[in-house]
């Protein structure tokens, strides 16, 4: 978020479970497709917001399980916690706002009188959220009775039922929709109101997102019954809210195209990357394209041919260098020559590469320094290195692509490869 000095071109606000993340997609293909699209075309001038019912603890667990990008803003615990950046700095103003007519002790006292409510795990109990499980056929009656009792005790709360079993009690000012409205107001006060905002969800606790004025919305194909019922009652004829035909992250990509919010072809959907025609030099796209080629090479999905290696050498300066995370420095061309040895070595394995936080900085009239995290996943093992790449447009055309002149990598703390010799680029 700090990299933006003006309004974001697009702000995507997405739920995680069964929206951005498809738990029925073991290869995480739709998520990886979105990742490549975002890093290649949007990261530099847009905002990615994850809005989840998960607590910080469970959110961090999900990030370890799935190949997720780092969001600019994270809204957690059903809109009761807002944090910023990779360091997840809390929004103190939002916390203070939620304290109005909220008393967690009273909520606990009143809910203890309902044996039908089963308290969720301790990690899901937050300062401004008390969470339970409840049977579907009991939810409506309990919600009505409990709301009345809490109001009589002087509280102003909202009770959200979602997922066919989850019941969350929050301050009235909380919730995913209120958190989004707060963010939009804050960005507007800073002169950075996004040009377009797209809200994405699949369950009842996402409904509020679709009621915020001037926000586009997509309910993914696998949206739950309670959200579709809300749409039928509140937004059936709205041209700004669609029910996608694609699941999860694929549905988000579909919505970007439907509303004409920007590029909607993921680099992962381009069969021949040499066919990509760009109007200008786009350093982030070059980085994404390079590592997608490397993934396909190691998975044996592209032919082991001299032509591919020649094309790779053509975008590298002959004197260009690569500093391996171990500290060893080599010429880029020598590194490319060694790729013969690893062609198809990950064939049949769950091997994926993705890049995160791709941020280009123009450091000269014809050069860019691009920083990012490069991740590799093979089975259950994942490694990551902090990478900086120096790219040049000197003596090349847009059709040729940028020239790689230097690559430098260092291991991300706690994510180093057990065998450094197996790490290429």
From Swiss-Prot:
Disruption phenotype: Plants show chlorosis, inhibition of photosynthesis, reduced growth rate and altered photosynthetic carbon partitioning in favor of starch. It holds the Pfam family S6PP_C. One of its GO terms (biological process) is sucrose biosynthetic process. InterPro entries: HAD-like_sf, HAD-SF_hydro_IIB, HAD_sf, NTF2-like_dom_sf, SPP-like_dom, SPP_C, Sucrose_Phosphatase, Sucrose_phosphatase_pln/cyn. Keywords: Hydrolase, Magnesium. It is an enzyme of class 3 (hydrolase). It comes from the Eukaryota. Its cofactor is Mg(2+). The keyword Methyltransferase does not apply. GO terms for molecular function: magnesium ion binding; sucrose-phosphate phosphatase activity. Inhibited by EDTA. It catalyses: sucrose 6(F)-phosphate + H2O = sucrose + phosphate. Its EC number is 3.1.3.24. CDD domains: HAD_SPP. Pathway: Glycan biosynthesis; sucrose biosynthesis; sucrose from D-fructose 6-phosphate and UDP-alpha-D-glucose: step 2/2. Belongs to the sucrose phosphatase family. Catalyzes the final step of sucrose synthesis. Homodimer. This is Sucrose-phosphatase 1.
């Amino acid at each position: 978020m700090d990299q933006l000095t003006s309004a974001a071109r697009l702000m995507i606000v997405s739920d995680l479970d069964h929206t951005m993340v498809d738990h029925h997609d073991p290869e995480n293909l739709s998520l990886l497709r979105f990742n490549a699209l975002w890093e290649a075309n949007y990261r530099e001038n847009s905002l990615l917001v994850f809005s989840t019912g998960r607590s910080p603890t469970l959110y961090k667990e999900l990030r370890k399980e799935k190949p997720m990008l780092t969001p600019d803003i994270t809204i957690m615990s059903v809109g009761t916690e807002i944090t910023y950046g990779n360091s997840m700095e809390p929004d103190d103003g939002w916390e203070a706002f939620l304290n109005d007519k909220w008393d967690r002790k009273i909520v606990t006292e009143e809910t203890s009188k309902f044996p039908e409510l089963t308290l969720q795990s301790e990690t899901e109990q937050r300062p401004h959220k008390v969470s339970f499980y409840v049977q579907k056929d009991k939810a409506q009656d309990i919600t009505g009775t409990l709301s009345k009792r809490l109001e009589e005790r002087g509280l102003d709360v909202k009770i959200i039922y979602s997922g066919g079993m989850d019941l969350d009690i929050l301050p009235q000012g909380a919730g995913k929709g209120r958190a989004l409205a707060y963010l939009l107001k804050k960005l507007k006060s800073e002169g950075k109101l996004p040009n377009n905002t797209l809200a994405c969800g699949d369950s009842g606790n996402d409904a509020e997102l679709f009621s915020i004025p001037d926000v586009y919305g997509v309910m993914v194909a696998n949206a739950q019954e309670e959200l579709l019922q809300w749409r039928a009652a509140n937004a059936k004829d709205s041209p700004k809210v669609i029910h996608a035909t694609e699941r999860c992250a694929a549905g988000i990509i579909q919505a970007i195209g439907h509303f004409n919010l920007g590029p909607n072809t993921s680099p992962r959907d381009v069969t021949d990357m040499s066919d990509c025609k760009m109007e200008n030099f786009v350093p982030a796209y070059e980085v994404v394209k390079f590592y997608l080629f490397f993934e396909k090479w190691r998975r044996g999905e592209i032919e082991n041919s001299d032509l591919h290696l020649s094309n790779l050498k053509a975008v590298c300066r002959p004197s260009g260098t690569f500093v391996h995370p171990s500290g060893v420095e080599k010429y880029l061309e020598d590194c490319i020559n060694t790729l013969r040895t690893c062609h198809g070595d990950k064939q049949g394995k769950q091997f994926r590469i993705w890049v995160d936080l791709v941020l280009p900085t123009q450091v000269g009239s014809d050069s860019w320094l691009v920083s990012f995290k490069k991740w590799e996943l093979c089975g259950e093992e994942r490694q990551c290195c902090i990478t900086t790449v120096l790219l040049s447009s000197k003596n090349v055309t847009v059709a040729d692509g940028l020239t790689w002149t230097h690559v430098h990598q260092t291991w991300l703390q706690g994510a180093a490869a057990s065998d450094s010799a197996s790490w290429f680029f």
